[in-house]
Amino acid sequence: MITGVFSMRLWTPVGVLTSLAYCLHQRRVALAELQEADGRRPVDRSLLKSKMVQVVFRHGARSPRKPLPLEEQVEWNPQLLEVPPQTQFDYTVTNLAGGPKPYSPYDAQYCETTLKGGMFAGQLTKVGMQQMFALGERLRKNYVEDIPFLSPTFSPQEVFIRSTNIFRNLESTRCLLAGLFQCQKEGPIIIHTDEADSEVLYPNYQSCWSLRQRTRGRRQTASLQPGISEDLKKVKDRMGIDSSDKVDFFILLDNMAAEQAHNLPSCPMLKRFAQMIEQRAVDTSLYILPKEDRESLQMAVGPLLHILESNLLKAMDSATAPDKIRKLYLYAAHDVTLIPLLMTLGIFDHKWPPFAVDLTMELYQHLESKEWFVQLYYHGKEQVPRGCPDGLCPLDMFLNAMSVYTLSPEKYHALCSQTQVMEVGNGE
């Protein structure tokens, strides 16, 4: 968990997107009239051609971001940082414009916390690297072996990679690519990232003033809410954590998940209350960023939705130059990205996103009707997005559902800079 300069050339102009969406809608209306005449038939999937895959994923297992204030501390041995040989894959990190890698304030912050045993906080471990390699192998099976969509060797003409500028995410991406392409490449691997103050691959409470203001009260009072407050007191009392210590369900879950992933001995009470801790962490997150607060959700993930939407529309536009589109788009994000993203798509399962989880968006075109479809998978399981009749969703219906939360860079900056903001649900 974590609490571009927008390169305008990387964003499709709003007017173009609107025109493309309108044309797509008109084409679907005409097709619907034909289908209505003879009765709508199920889509023949054998006539669907893969056009694009977009994957938003969480990094692999890591050390906790902040240790619990317990007398007996879990030991985080630096041997856990050993790099599995099969995950070795050279890469370069640039900013969005192709310039030098930006400074990472988060990594600097993590290096200020040394855990018992010698590891720094928030570091990707060997376990996490193996998880990401396994995710890459699953993607290889899906898009190289089962369906020959991607080349078996990495090619920068086929793959675009974007990550937050945090080392565990960059390294997770390396391991995923190693699994996906078995360490074979034709051309350099470039991972694009952004400055922390303009990053949109997580809800940016630091730079989006309105988002920070709208949620500030809820963040301060979340642990005081009925049910959450009583359960937090119970867990802290049983674990011997003083009531004055600033430990919430996020910190408890963070340590619990990290210890479980590495099979490390932990406080028995942490194991006993594992289910409650996860559920209350989810409840806390939904209190801070509720589904009823549309504008906050827009500011949290609206720009990322816009990026995903832009890629879809560029792919179906015959006027798009071949060098402006990729077959695969990879986005290395975080749990705090995935929760609101899944909420906006109507597929959040009220479970905390685990390490190395992925949200995969596939784009298809029907070979005969030329109609476009989107298919979503979360954690490898087919999903039915909000506003869609089933898993295989007509693209215009999917875009219409996304439009409720999608924000162009201009609208994002306008919303974030609002000077008067009314907090929603503060303490209620």
From Swiss-Prot:
GO terms for biological process: lysobisphosphatidic acid metabolic process. Its EC number is 3.1.3.2. Its main location: mitochondrion. Keywords: Hydrolase, Lipid metabolism, Mitochondrion, Phospholipid metabolism, Transit peptide. The keyword Endoplasmic reticulum does not apply. Pfam families: His_Phos_2. GO terms for molecular function: acid phosphatase activity; lysophosphatidic acid phosphatase activity. GO terms for cellular component: mitochondrion. It is an enzyme of class 3 (hydrolase). It is found in: Mitochondrion. Hydrolyzes lysophosphatidic acid (LPA) containing a medium length fatty acid chain to the corresponding monoacylglycerol. Has highest activity with lysophosphatidic acid containing myristate (C14:0), monounsaturated oleate (C18:1) or palmitate (C16:0), and lower activity with C18:0 and C6:0 lysophosphatidic acid. Belongs to the histidine acid phosphatase family. This is Lysophosphatidic acid phosphatase type 6. It comes from Pongo abelii. The gene is ACP6.
